[in-house]
Design a protein with these regions (language model features):
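A short, basic N-terminal segment
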Residues: 1-77, 220, 229
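Hydrophobic anchor at the beta1->P-loop junction of P-loop NTPases
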Residues: 83
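Conserved nucleotide-sensing/catalytic segment adjacent to the nucleotide-binding pocket
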Residues: 114-185
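Hydrophobic positions on the alpha1 helix immediately C-terminal to the Walker A/P-loop
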Residues: 94, 98
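Conserved glycine(s) of the Walker
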Residues: 88-91
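Walker A/P-loop NTP-binding motif
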Residues: 100-103
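Walker A (P-loop) ATP-phosphate-binding motif of ABC ATPase nucleotide-binding domains
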Residues: 80
């Protein structure tokens, strides 16, 4: 007789088992999507203004911010975001606006609902943004690399412009791939901007990382518009 799984028994045991597992809280905003849209738009405008540029909420910009707002207010969001598109269309500006928005909400204790009081766990949404080349450079400083890969919220700007592999004392390393694998395994929130297409990501990092991205990242594709003058 072939083996058979007792579904009723599995459903009975699963809650007992999962209570003993500490699953990381996933970053989300505890508010309506429209409220998140207005909040993110305000921080986006502030970022643009800080660079002495004119703030324009055209259709593309509004749509991109709205998609981010929808994602970050979902009941069970993925544990990351990827903004894809050509240079100069606002990807980095939106990522920095998101970082400032998270910091502003955290200062007002917005994320206390993500604390796990049973285990005494406090959710700390500290977000750091690094240029992807800084990750490659950290391959020569393992303590720095460990710090980056374990950061609670990490923004990686301009993924794809770095060499896929680097040499360190005769060893061939893939620091970006290793960092992403670690963050995927530990469900750490990762925010990425890139000029690469999905196909180019697969070609550069391999199908394994492309598959990881599909599971961990909500992707927002920016249309071919540039705001740099």
């Amino acid at each position: 007789m072939p083996p058979k799984i007792d579904i009723n028994r599995v459903e009975e045991l699963m809650p007992v088992i999962t209570r003993r597992m500490i699953t990381p809280s996933r970053l989300r905003f505890n508010m309506a999507s429209d409220d998140a849209l207005n909040l993110l738009a305000s921080f986006f405008a502030a970022q643009v203004k800080s660079r002495c540029q004119k703030v324009e909420f055209d259709e593309n910009t509004t749509e991109n911010i709205a998609k981010l707002a929808d994602f970050i207010t979902a009941a069970v969001p993925k544990f990351g975001i990827m903004l894809c598109g050509r240079c100069g269309n606002g990807k980095t500006t939106l990522m920095r606006a998101f970082q400032q928005c998270v910091n502003w909400l955290d200062a007002r204790h917005h994320f206390e609902f993500l604390d796990d009081k049973e285990y005494g766990y406090r959710y700390k949404p500290n977000m750091k943004i690094v240029d992807v080349r800084e990750i490659v450079q950290s391959a020569h400083d393992f303590d720095r690399f460990k710090e980056l890969r374990a950061y609670p919220l990490l923004g990686i700007d301009d993924l794809g412009k770095e060499p896929a592999e680097v040499m360190n004392y005769g060893n061939l390393l893939s620091p970006v791939v290793e960092l992403i694998e670690h963050r995927y395994t530990n469900q750490l929130f990762t925010f990425i901007t890139t000029n690469l297409t999905a196909k180019e990501i697969g070609n550069k990092y391999g199908t394994r990382i492309a598959d990881r991205f599909n599971e961990m990242l909500h992707v927002i594709i920016f249309k071919d518009t540039t705001y740099r003058h």
